Regions:
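Conserved catalytic motifs of ABC-family nucleotide-binding domains
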Residues: 158
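Conserved ABC transporter NBD signature motif
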Residues: 60-68
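Conserved ABC nucleotide-binding domain
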Residues: 125-139
């Protein structure tokens, strides 16, 4: 599992009068389960892109277990993300024509890391996410089943952190509830830190901590509130 420490982070985009994201300091302990909430345009997606290394910031430090990914080259960030971060997104980014298992294994195959053990883990993960037909083509699956495949893919390389961006937003209520429960249960079982961006209040309430963004700033943090109350 990975811890996250952010210091003096500012993300600005051309044409905007104020930063899209500004965080003076934020720490997330290894093994934490954290909900990221806030209105549209509050900075949540920028936060995900920055901490996952999908975008680079030129101002601030983003340390995963002490490694500052803000200082990495793009190729090094990509390698770090592949080895340490499992991503589950609202859009599943699965490939039609490939089976559930082939989609789970695809990133490992592209990285030349699809060993026998990894393939066996792929099979096992599909069972753990509730899918009994690894050879089933993606295009024949429901959206809830597709998200289960995406969760299996995210867990394949035993990531230290799982980052999920609105993982239940495109699902119906029943499927969303099942996928949310599955994501949390698997993160606990795997020992992964979990960061979930979500408007799903039921899912957010199951997590240990809630951080709310507004206009690119942290407007509320349940951990800080708990510390003040103590």
């Amino acid at each position: 599992m990975l811890s996250l420490d952010i210091e003096n982070l500012t993300v600005a985009f051309p044409g905007l009068s104020s930063p899209a994201l500004a965080i003076g300091r934020l720490s997330i302990d290894a093994g934490s389960r954290v909900a990221i909430t806030g209105a549209s345009g509050s900075g949540k997606s920028t936060f995900v892109n920055i901490v996952a290394g999908l975008e680079r910031t030129r101002q601030g430090r983003i340390r995963w277990n002490g490694e500052d990914i803000a200082s990495f080259s793009e190729s090094r960030r990509d390698r770090f993300r592949a080895a340490n971060i499992g991503l589950v997104m609202q859009e599943f980014h699965l490939f039609p024509g490939l089976s559930a298992l082939e989609n789970v294994l695809l990133p490992a195959r592209l990285a030349g890391a699809a060993t026998v053990d990894v393939i066996e883990r792929g099979h096992a993960l599909l069972g753990r996410v509730g899918l009994s037909r690894p050879g089933q083509k993606i295009e024949t699956m429901s959206r809830g089943e597709m998200q289960r495949v995406a969760i299996g893919r995210a867990l394949l390389r035993k990531p230290g952190v799982i980052i999920a961006d609105e993982p239940t937003a495109s699902l119906d209520a029943e499927s969303g509830e099942a996928v949310g429960d599955l994501l949390l249960d698997l993160a606990i079982a795997e020992g992964s830190t979990l960061i979930v961006v979500s408007h799903d209040q039921r899912l957010a309430c199951r997590l240990d901590r809630r951080i709310t963004f507004g206009s690119g700033l942290i407007s509320e943090d349940s951990a800080a509130a708990a510390g003040e109350a103590a």
